[in-house]
Amino acid sequence: MDTSTTYDALVIGSGIGGMEAAIKLGDMGHRVLVVEKEPSIGGKMILLSKVFPTLDCASCISTPKMAATAHHPNVTVLTQSLVESVRGDAERGFQVTVRRAARYVDEALCTGCRLCETACTVAVPDQFNGEMVSRRAAYIPFPQAIPQKALVERPGTSPCTFGCPAGIKAHGYVSLVRSGKHEEAFGLVAETTPLVGTLGRACYAPCETACTRGSLEGPVSIRRLKRFIADTHYALPEPPTTERPAPNGKRVAVVGSGPAGLTAAWQLARNGYGVRIIESAPAAGGAPRLSIPSYRLPAEVVERDLVNVTDLGVEIVTGTRVDDLEELRNQGFDAVVVATGTPRPARLHVAGEESLSGVHAALDFLRDIRLGQPQDLTGKVVVVIGGGNVAIDAARSARRLGAAAVHMVCLERRAGMPAFGWEVDEALSEGVLLHDGWGIAGFRGTGSVEAVELKRCTSVVDDAGRFRPSYDEAHRDGLDCDVAIVAVGMGADTAAFPLLAPAGTRVLQTDPTTLQTAIPWVFAAGDAVTGPTTIAQAVGHGRRAAHMVDRWLRGLELAGFDEPLPVVDKAEVLARQGTHSRREPFDAAVRLAEAPKDFAELEPALSETEARQASGRCLDCGVCSECHQCLAACPADAIDLGMRPQRLEVEVSAVVVSTGYRLFPADLKPQYGWGRFKNVITGTQMERLLAPTRPYNTVLRPGDGRVPERIAYVMCTGSRDQTVGNPLCSKFCCMYSLKQNQLIMGALPLADVTVHYIDIRAAGKGYDEFFEQARAMGTTFVKGRVAGITEKEDGNLVLRYEDIDGGGVIAEAEYDLVVLAVGVQPNPEAAHPFAHGALTLDEHGYVAEVDEDLNPGATSIPGVFVAGAASGARDIPESILHSGAAVAQAAAQLERRRVPG
């Protein structure tokens, strides 16, 4: 592509008028820049079936014009681009800012093979075919598109993906499950982390909180779909493994095998690093393996996730504590990632906590259970202190170990508990007794704990929002117990790494962006840096650490991690969808009991059918799901999802505005039912049904695919109508409707076609003869307005209309298909690039000409000219002629600039 920044002329818009202007100016030797907002040049003419009155093929006329424009040596075309501003004047020239949207496909590499389109998992309405059929998010707009290059529709990031702190492409794997591509879905999640099964069970699913469908019947079951993916993959006799890359000769040690450490190791190993994980516990897996109970996350699931890591060549060493990072350096490791989590339980610092037996830290209590050394709580009374996730897990685990009663005491009132509401509900359903709004005054007992002393908590945080509980010391109570379990927080093991955690700090200190510590070759990630978070957040931190380590070892700037597009607006998504079929979410059907007896997993797995149905509820908010199937399918490696919009600054001497018209939105006439009744279509949609490249193999009605036998046209829909603010005749609606009548007679010889009209206006060479020809072919014409359209149960439509020639009676008629001959409106974008009010519009909103008779094409801004339907409703021949006038004006302007005075 020409990368020049100076041109003779700018043509805004590439419809028939814009292309004509560009070609003619180019033929004169002027260098022309054409800016088109759509992915292809061609405008609206390429949508047509044939042109009137000759019934020549519209594509056969427009495609040579498109090719001549695109391949003209003096013409440069920018598609998917918008002129943001035009500044300057005719004497000094114009400075133009162009915003070029990202295509997400390298046009220089793309061969137009459409394999990306075949692989794409997201179907969206096809604008080229009037949204009567679907296309893919990765697509070429239409068969004759120029450039014949693919693009990916990405208005933004889907809320579920944007809301995932792990960085998993949630929308992507949902769309893959919907398409039956389960292994590809597993691979997509594994691009982020090896903990597919773990996250499928133990993640708190912020993606579901963000899901747009949540504002309708309820969110898509995104987390359960991830579990389905993992279960399906692990059930294979020989699941495919990630191919080991060639070693790059460098080694990294990862201290800690929790979600952050495992993810960092996984990402580094995928980049060819030799990785060793060093874990102080007797088993790898961190909190998922040692803290989360089996009824939520079975140990075998975590262990199977660990196989993903070791299959990639990562070495895991357990039962080994690291206290000297320099020793790792001496062992030949080029970098170290510290991801030791928060293994230190917080203390209450009250009487009896240290001196009485039977007072346990929740982390130790849960760890003993996971390592096969549970306490026998049969018949005992247990008090769990805390209101978070760990406290809930401890309380529910105590019930499963036979406790006669389990009391849960927390500072917060129930609504303010850190634990999720559903966790609290499930705990209460299992018989846990909640005492909210109480603090701990101390423990009582002789040698072993016998009671917990309580004091009323009046507030948990101070006025600044800091954790600083206040108590009513006079309001006391107590609970007798045999065992007390303290779950009031966790902290990092800072004592092991004094250089990374100076005195007085509670977590390891890193640069918040790069995660690099004070020791350049040491990075830290996960809860050891952030304090207690979720598994997904720790995974995201581990990914970031691996990215930064990789860049540091390659001598690159520590930047460039996860730069997603902005999240799409949910209101726009719902508006884009139009109507929604109600699709209820699946009930989790968790197996709860007042006295649970074992640690068997509670949540059932989704079946194949349920997974398809659940994924089918997705609204495809971001259109492109980032499933990466196009990346895998493209033989030219042309897909680049990292592309971003660009702004270009160019200078021109003349501007031609050829932005065309807007079609009247038929839903502004609600009495006609367009958008509600599937068998009410617009004239543009009928053009597509009649075109050689039509969406169906014949003319069918969209509602049920039947061949229509009775077809009605409603003329002047949105034209000559003060109720919608358009008193003008749209000039060519009558003629395109007559053209379609004749084509319908050819395609459906037995069809009856009736035209409900106000007046037939056929002013042009051969136009009246065209009207008479349609009448002779059998079209029925009924003079009078249509009052409204209603739909019958079978999809047929009843028109209520006046019949002026029949005495002015109000009548009704039934049709299989109704076509609204929509009119045209001015394009409001025509004046946007110019300073407010600089480009004068006429009273209807079209670009005003100084004198359309004596000075056609000239606008209120010297050096800026208008061509075609941007200045008023025009058919194709008129647009071409008017474009010629604008070209003559622009050429004269360029000549004046070339030869001053």
Question: Which stretches of residues belong to each language-model region?
Answer:
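Beta1-alpha1 glycine-rich phosphate/pyrophosphate-binding loop at the start
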Residues: 7-71, 134-140, 159, 165-179, ...
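Non-heme iron-sulfur electron-transfer modules
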Residues: 38-64, 78-109, 121-159, 168-194, ...
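A Rossmann-like FAD-binding core segment of flavoenzymes
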Residues: 64-106, 298-351, 360-378, 400-505, ...
